[in-house]
From Swiss-Prot:
It holds the Pfam family HLH. GO terms for biological process: cellular response to low-density lipoprotein particle stimulus; cellular response to starvation; cholesterol homeostasis; cholesterol metabolic process; lipid biosynthetic process; negative regulation of cholesterol efflux; negative regulation of transcription by RNA polymerase II; positive regulation of cholesterol biosynthetic process. Residues 114-134 have a biased composition (Pro residues). Phosphorylated by AMPK, leading to suppress protein processing and nuclear translocation, and repress target gene expression. The gene is Srebf2. This is Sterol regulatory element-binding protein 2. The record marks 460-461, 476-477, 514-515 as: Cleavage. The keyword Nucleotidyltransferase does not apply.
Amino acid sequence: MDENSELGGLETMETLTELGDELTLGDIDEMLQFVSNQVGEFSDLFSEQLCSSFPGGGGGSGSGGTSNNSSGRGTSGGAADPAVQRSFSQVPLSTFSPSSTSPQAPALQVKVSPTPPRATPVLQPRPQPQPQPPAQLQQQTVMITPTFSTAPQTRIIQQPLIYQNAATSFQVLQPQVQSLVTSSQVQPVTIQQQVQTVQAQRVLTQTANGTLQTLAPATVQTVATPQVQQVPVLVQPQIIKTDSLVLTTLKTDGSPVMAAVQNPALTALTAPIQTAALQVPTLVGSNGAILTTMPVMMGQEKVPIKQVPGGVKQLEPPKEGERRTTHNIIEKRYRSSINDKIIELKDLVMGTDAKMHKSGVLRKAIDYIKYLQQVNHKLRQENMVLKLANQKNKLLKGIDLGSLVDSDVDLKIDDFNQNVLLMSPPASDSGSQAGFSPYSIDSEPGSPLLDDAKVKDEPDSPPVALGMVDRSRILLCVLTFLGLSFNPLTSLLQWGGAHNPDQHPYSGSGRNVLSLESGSGGWFDWMMPTLLLWLLNGVIVLSVFVKLLVHGEPVIRPHSRSSVTFWRHRKQADLDLAKGDFAAAAANLQTCLSVLGRALPTSRLDLACSLSWNVIRYSLQKLRLVRWLLKKVFQRWRATPATAAGFEDEAKSSARDAALAYHRLHQLHITGKLPAGSACSDVHMALCAVNLAECAEEKIPPSTLVEIHLTAAMGLKTRCGGKLGFLASYFLNRAQSLCGPEHSAVPDSLRWLCHPLGQKFFMERSWSIKSAAKDSLYCAQRNPADPIAQVHQAFCKHLLERAVEALVKPQAKKKAGDREEESCEFSSALEFLKLLHSFVDSVGFVASPFSSSSVLRSALGPDVVCRWWTSAITVAISWLQGDDAAVRSHFTEVERVPKALEVTESPLVKAVFYACRAMHASLSGKADGQQNSFCHCERASGHLWSSLNVSGTTSDPSLNHVVQLLTCDLLLSLRTTLWQKQASASQLLGETYHASGTELAGFQRDLGSLRRLAHSFRPAYRKVFLHEATVRLMAGASPTRTHQLLEHSLRRRTTQNTKHGEVDTWPGQRERATAILLACRHLPLSFLSSPGQRAVLLAEAARTLEKVGDRRSCSDCQQMIVKLGGGTAIAAS
């Protein structure tokens, strides 16, 4: 070999040389003890790696075995298994002759250049040496001179070190105690013949270029012969290609045993040897280079390495910190194993390309495990549903219902009790009574899910309680009707009377004496057959009623297994409704109906039969005679000892459960949460819910009964339209009658329907129920699956709109003498607001997961959003009326803006809020009160302009327009009031006040907002002329144009011969009175009529302002009248 190759191998061994200069064999023994202790503590960690090195258990065969690691990462074993070490140490030592060994084991010599002494380095990962071509691999040989020697004791020393660098490649270092560099002249040493333990060759992979880096630790064996000198042999780490790697074992007879390695992912080569001859595990490259370590015998005594001849120099004793190196290496290996598993977990859960830290990987893994558990739970439920459907099909073919939970379907009671916690939803109330299930709601009986004593092994129901199919009911009704129509009993009785033997004539020979028949029978003879006939018909009809309404109704026992199945799906449906999973809730509710024996119709024929039967049943239940007969039949069943006690209660409970299931399905259908079905299907579910709820009687709360009737009315109005509108009105009146004469039984959430305005809105207004309604700015969010809550939300917005419209565009009403007169603006608005405030106090906006009677009912509580708008409009009305105390009292509620409105960041809400603050600040008696009011007006004006510029569709456009008009009118009126106060103060001082540029700019901006709003909302025109005249007065403009604008508000108009929509643009009474005040106060005398006519106008304005309730303006008008009566000039300025 050339000198460059030798220098390249020397550079690779620098670190190993530095580590071995300062250690002794005593240190090696201490390290071995420490490692063996670590093996005892981490037995699981080392046993896995040991098994990968020694296939087949603890011992190995004579031939070397290979083991492939699927992960592609190399592992290094710790200490050898003690059992393996004992098995090797018990073999007696033998000797071999030099003649037999020398020719078969040729002398090998290691050519290594001398290395200068260097300081002891600290163990740390270093970059992997670049792989070199196989042709440049150096061949290392060791000269061996065998002699005979014996040793009473042997010791196995091995401790490989593994490091991992940042480039995802592995570096394998030699054990510290064996890392010594020999001189270029190797002295002969004695080699013991018996090799007791040969450490498995470690081959590490997963490098960037697909090569293997291997380093075989030297197996060292010591003997007690004092003449033996120890020479540690170091073999340089080599980089070889996996395609040319060959495993060979050198024997004493010279015949190598070769095993080709074909798998590039080879991670470990093991060669435990136990033979009489010397065997050395060797890796041979494609060019014949030997890349392995020869076992060398060492002395038994702890001879310091510094005393070994051969040019090894004495170094300083090892430092104390280096003794923990092995412990740190083990810890790093332990952490490396954990990191590998976390990486494998990441690849399984998120894929190989995902990047996430360890805690995130574990969190995702936990979430994925929970998801798999949920999927398993749903699959288990689907399996249960399919089994139930299979049993139902068998039931229709004549199989007993008791086979529903037979042992053939693997639903034994023991397995069910073990898995009930996984199949049942969590408890809704931790404080439930012991007699009820923790999974039941308070107002309904508990389900025996966890009580073994309650789950009976009896059949689900007696044969009579299985129920009849609706087709069978209709067939029986048709046969009964045909029987009563044709009445075959009449012909039967007549035939029996004709064949009476007493009336047969004598047919013998002779004469008969004529005689008269006596009429002793009288009227009873012809009445008796008729009475008997009707009696028989009545018995037949009564039997049919009993069969249909008593025996034909399916009833389940409270603690049967069918009841358990029903309650399990019922609770799951409640949870799905609370989570918003309406499709899953509908599936569970349909399963509940199937368990109850009331499956939904699947074909048109079944739907027609079911709908017809429910119409007939609802008609029969209204007959008092039928209800009395059914009650007597139930009492007879109760008194009969052969039947189960409480059959009537069980029947009512089953009817209640079925009614609630039908009711909730009906709610989901009419709110659009499920795929749209036919109108007949909705009517069918509504009638089923009503019929069964009335059959339940006292088992169902009155509030729930009212809710079921109202939902049926809504379903008929929305789905059937005008065709069956009278039925919607009938069910609405029926619901009101159930509330009692004083509406004592009606819940607070339904009280609005008992008000005349609520009834009128329900029947006349064109409201609609949407499946995905937009979030409203004026009402809090209601339960999306409750149609009554959605209609109530529409009614609240309707009342709010009516209240604001009464302020901005009051409607004219006709009295007896055909004299048109506007209604009082403020009183009508306050009436609507008071009614709205009473209705929003009892209806909430969040659906409760487990409410008292219905999951879909909104939780009780006030609608804080609608209440805030009510308070804001009340503050505006109070300020316009001049009621300062009411403004201050209601302003405290306006300051508390709900969080739902704060989140929206709506500019209209901010405009209303700052307008209310400006009105409140204008009432302050402080010096800076008017300035603060002006600042709030500026901020409100900016937000109002932003709300007008907002593009996009809103959920309530008409309500937005009236609120924007009211806010703009309030800001302009407030600015006018502030200007008049300053002008009045200047008049008292004898000065003339002119509005500043800032005041005029703010007024012009609000006036521009009013003009822009008038383009899309015509009622805003009635305010435009008045405020245009006001801004001209503030600016001191020409009074001619100002007088024309005021005349536009002063003229009276009639509604005759007017086009549609023009009435909305005419000024109202309040605008006319305000125009009179402005003209009399600010216009010159030349533009006004005589003083007598001026007094008439002021008196008329005073009456108008007093009627509408504007106290502030009315007081100003009366003061002007007083001044005019005293002879003071009104317009001296």
